Amino acid sequence: MSKKAPAKEGKKLPRAATWYEIDMEKGVFRFKNKLCPKCGSVMAFHREPVPRWHCGKCGFTQFQR
């Protein structure tokens, strides 16, 4: 019989909670990452080999200066 894994200590936030910045004073939350200007999907930031924002859906890339 398989045994259950031991319970993890401390409560982890859901993964989606790490995608937003929450300002409790103003009661506002906003998305941390950029949205693609071409298709509206979420863009990922890559540091190597050159810092850039890249959309995995449509392939749009915006290089940092």
From Swiss-Prot:
Q: How is the cofactor bound?
A: Binds 1 zinc ion per subunit.
**A cellular component term, taken from the record's GO annotations:** ribonucleoprotein complex
UniProt binding sites for Zn(2+): 36, 39, 55, 58
One Gene Ontology term from the biological process aspect of the record = translation
Q: Which cofactor does it need?
A: Zn(2+)
UniProt keyword annotations, A-Z: Metal-binding, Ribonucleoprotein, Ribosomal protein, Zinc, Zinc-finger
Please give one Pfam family short name: Ribosomal_S27
Family listed: Belongs to the eukaryotic ribosomal protein eS31 family.
Describe its partners and assembly state: Part of the 30S ribosomal subunit.
Recorded protein name is: Small ribosomal subunit protein eS31
* Native organism: Pyrobaculum calidifontis (strain DSM 21063 / JCM 11548 / VA1)
